């Protein structure tokens, strides 16, 4: 099917008026033009300040549950993009209690950390692996990636406000304007840093992120990860939320230490 280009009437009239003038001046030498370099986007202080306030809020939370409904694009060898959907639920109780459940189109995984033991559970296959481990939630997220090759979805939630996500890494920052996510009044921000464009919608009342869009600029097709977040910062979390108890048909396996680049536990 051929593609049709439809131009506004006003633009057609303008082109008709300009055409004779262009014909009359066709014999004149054309001045050599120099391409103008696109201006470098600025770092707006108000945008960086909003990110800083959000990071402080995240680091101040002592106990919370957050659910992210997400889509992730994967680029095939053909250059085509496939979109996968899923969700992840985090339950966190500072300083050292962690639970994550990942349920995507391709896999299910649960992660438990009770302050002394880290468990990875694959409910569909009924396999689980455990390792003794101590430290804070932030240390767990880092260890899971660096030692076992498990990169938690939305790991930035645990890194904002720490030296792993310094504000100095932001190369441009723009306040797009007000927006609403699931009826929550937000400020919409656009950021750029090396290899990544990302957008965040921050709730005006709670200062918590309500939506994230992350574009990978290292890939020419710029695949995106999109997540909408729902927060609960008031419901209490029990110790049992962070401890794994195997069922009769669950089987233990060993955790292999990382021998290859980390793969994100999609979504």
Residue ranges and their predicted role:
Residues 28-30, 35-52, 56-59, 121-186, ...:
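Flexible, processing/modification-adjacent segments and terminal tails
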Residues 42-127:
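N-terminal mature ectodomain segment of secretory-pathway/periplasmic proteins
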Residues 1-9:
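Bacterial N-terminal signal peptides that target proteins for export
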Residues 19-23:
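Sec/Tat signal peptide C-region and signal peptidase I cleavage site
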Residues 42-45, 69, 104, 119-120, ...:
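Gly/Pro-enriched, hydrophobic low-complexity segments
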Residues 77, 109-113, 122-123, 130-132, ...:
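A short, polar/proline- and glycine-enriched secondary-structure boundary/capping micro-motif
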Residues 2, 58, 201-202:
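Conserved short hydrophobic patches within well-ordered secondary structure
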Residues 8-18:
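Bacterial N-terminal signal peptides
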């Amino acid at each position: 099917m051929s593609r049709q280009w439809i131009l506004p009437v006003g633009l057609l009239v303008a082109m008709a008026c300009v055409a004779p003038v262009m014909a009359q001046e066709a014999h004149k030498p054309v001045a050599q033009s120099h391409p103008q370099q696109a201006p470098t986007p600025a770092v707006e202080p108000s945008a960086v300040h909003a990110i800083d306030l959000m990071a402080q809020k995240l680091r101040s939370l002592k106990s919370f549950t957050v659910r992210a409904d997400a889509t992730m694009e994967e680029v095939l060898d053909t250059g085509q993009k496939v979109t996968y959907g899923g969700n992840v639920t985090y339950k966190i109780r500072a300083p050292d209690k962690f639970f994550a459940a990942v349920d995507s189109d391709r896999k299910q995984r649960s992660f438990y950390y009770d302050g002394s033991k880290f468990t990875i559970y694959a409910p569909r296959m009924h396999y689980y692996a455990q390792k003794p481990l101590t430290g804070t939630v932030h240390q767990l997220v880092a260890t899971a990636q660096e030692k076992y090759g498990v990169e938690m979805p939305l790991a930035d939630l645990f890194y904002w406000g720490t030296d792993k996500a310094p504000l100095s890494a932001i190369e441009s920052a723009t306040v797009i304007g007000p927006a609403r996510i699931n009826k929550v009044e937000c400020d919409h921000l656009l950021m750029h840093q090396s290899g990544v464009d990302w957008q965040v919608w921050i709730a005006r009342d709670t200062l918590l992120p309500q939506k994230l869009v992350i574009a990978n600029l290292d890939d020419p097709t710029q695949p995106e990860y999109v997540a909408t977040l729902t927060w609960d910062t008031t419901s209490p979390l029990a110790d049992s939320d962070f401890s794994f108890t195997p069922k009769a048909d669950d089987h233990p396996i060993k955790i292999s230490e990382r021998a290859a680049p980390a793969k994100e536990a999609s979504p």
